[in-house]
Design a protein with these regions (language model features):
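Signal peptide processing junction and immediate N-terminal pro/mature segment
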Residues: 21-33
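Bacterial N-terminal signal peptides that target proteins for export
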Residues: 1-9
Length: 540
């Protein structure tokens, strides 16, 4: 792998070096001004992997603000907690492809009907093969179209609770046992088991009903074959780039085992055509950035820095690889390259990692503003970089599913919130890093007002909702109504939506500078559950 990375890095550095020599510099927002490339309006066909705001409009927003026309299917075609309309999505994509310069497509949507549907489907092998064939035909029918595709390896949640009801129903009962059994099988193949583990594996086989295990493993086998066929498409050039995500992964699991098998299968495919890494929800933002960078023949320089401590060596929750490896993959996906000196960078990606490498949770009681991860130092360092003229993007990953309140309070108090060029602190660490990078490499070319608009969405969601309002309202639901309402709001949804809207407006008034429309923002639940929210401003 080292030689493959070295070759690509040298190639990208060469292209970028000449671009840098030819570029002029000025001052804007505390950083060097990057002028957008003059161009005619370009069109990107975009099929998201589900209907969440982060998957759809938020992933596309930076490209749209740069002047690109991003064609997205009607949301009713996309999957959510239930299957979308893969046939309708295909006919829509086929009809729109002729007017597009590039396509960023979710193979999960076009084959299974969405990300969640990929874990629950009852499709036959023949149906799956036919749908893979459709994707292959997209390039044949539109020779000039660049096709960037992304899909997921079927995940292996650690328990029924962790699955969030997004697996087959039996996972709520047997999820922990399925996860453990798959992990022991992974270890058995790649390292061997102790006598105690061998006995535990036998006990688990007796505990999990055979029909449950058969259903789960047979679906995985079908999806695995689909992934092999998609890798073949990247091998032959039917896909210009295919990214396969190890969704909600762990070092010992079925997902990890399958990734090793697929890595061997793809040995001869260059990393410029196929990559496999932890994550999934961030891939649309990264590939849309890649499509823009390819169209404009731009290779952004990115300087990556971490909080003190283990930094890039940490293996984040829901991942099976060191963070530094995931970030290197993200850079290549976005068409960017890492540089050691921030003076030569288009942006500095500052990663807020926990010093000991152990992540917390956005909804944990200790996320009360107490500085557990030396956030004050990170905020001051970000301020010093900005004062020196560097464009800074922050990936906030000390916690899963929400921002670090201590960091955000420090950025607020130092007046830095709207001096950044990007921020993300939502869901998993790899989601946040990839999304921050995908938006960041484009936002450095945007006017300040547009950058502020992108930042506002993240602050309201990642900081306001996920780390504060959601936690408060969830606790109230548990005490006053029904703890089960978290996963299915049911009849409580209208009242909860009003409560969240009011609290989020109050949060913005206390923590953010005045911004048009924030005092009239509205909130909704795309999947009718507390975990995922959507924020709408009157003028957006």
């Amino acid at each position: 792998m080292g030689k493959r990375w070295s070759f690509v890095a040298v190639l990208l550095l060469t292209v970028s070096f000449f671009s840098w020599l030819m570029s002029g510099t000025g001052e804007a927002r505390g950083g060097k001004e990057v002028q957008p490339v003059e161009q005619q309006t370009k069109t990107i066909l975009f099929v998201p992997h589900d209907n969440r705001p982060t998957s759809c409009e938020q992933s596309a927003e930076a490209a749209e603000k740069l002047g690109y026309r991003v064609l997205m299917p009607p949301k009713e075609m996309l999957g959510g907690l239930t299957e979308g309309q893969p046939d309708a999505l295909w006919y829509w994509a086929e009809a729109q492809a002729a007017q597009a310069d590039a396509a960023v497509i979710s193979t999960d949507s076009l084959i299974y009907g969405g990300l969640v549907a990929s874990r629950k489907h009852e499709l036959s092998e023949q149906e799956l093969e036919e749908r893979v064939g459709r994707i292959a035909s997209l390039k044949k029918l539109n020779r000039r179209l660049k096709v960037y595709a992304f899909g997921s390896l079927m995940r292996t949640p650690v328990s029924g609770l962790a699955s969030g009801g997004e697996e087959p129903d039996y996972y709520l009962t047997y999820g922990a046992q399925i996860f453990r059994r798959s992990g022991l099988l992974d270890k058995q193949e790649h390292g061997g088991l102790t006598d105690g583990e061998t006995q535990e594996l036998q006990d688990l086989a007796a505990t999990i009903p055979s029909e449950v295990w058969q259903d789960w493993t047979q679906r995985r086998a079908k999806n695995f074959t689909v992934d092999e066929r998609l890798i073949d498409l990247s091998r032959t050039g039917a896909l210009d780039l295919f990214i396969l995500g190890k969704d909600d992964n762990a070092p010992l699991s079925a997902t990890h085992a399958e990734s090793l098998w697929l890595a061997r299968y793809a040995t001869a495919v260059p990393c410029t055509r196929f990559q496999m890494l932890a994550g999934i929800d961030e891939f649309a933002a990264l590939l849309l950035a890649r499509a823009v960078n390819d169209e404009e023949h731009v290779v952004p320089f990115v300087n990556v820095q971490y909080n003190w401590g283990v930094g890039g060596a940490m293996v984040p929750d829901y991942s099976d690889e060191p963070l530094v490896d995931s970030i290197q993959s993200d850079l290549l996906i976005a068409g960017a390259v890492a540089v050691p000196d921030p003076a030569h960078a288009d942006l500095v990606l500052l990663v807020n990692t926990p010093p000991d490498g152990k992540m917390g949770y956005g909804n944990a009681p200790d996320n009360d503003g107490t500085d557990l991860y030396d956030a004050q130092s990170l905020a001051r360092y970000a301020g010093s970089l900005i004062a020196q003229g560097y464009r800074v993007v922050i990936a906030d990953i000390t916690r899963t599913n929400g921002a670090d309140n201590a960091l955000m309070n420090a950025l607020r108090d130092e007046g830095l919130l709207f001096k950044l060029y990007g921020y993300a602190g939502w869901n998993t660490a790899t989601n946040s890093v990839g999304f921050a990078l995908g938006q960041g490499v484009l936002s450095v070319r945007l006017p300040e007002d547009d950058v502020d608009c992108l930042l506002l969405a993240r602050y309201l969601d990642d900081w306001g909702y996920q780390s504060n309002v959601r936690t408060a309202v969830t606790n109230q639901l548990a005490m006053l109504l029904d703890g089960g309402a978290y996963l299915n709001l049911g009849r409580y949804e209208p009242a909860v939506r009003l409560r969240v809207t009011r609290l989020l407006r109050d949060f913005a008034a206390r923590n953010l500078p005045p911004y048009p429309g924030v005092d009239h923002l509205n909130f909704y639940f795309p999947w009718h559950r507390m975990f995922i929210g959507g924020i709408v401003l009157p003028d957006r």
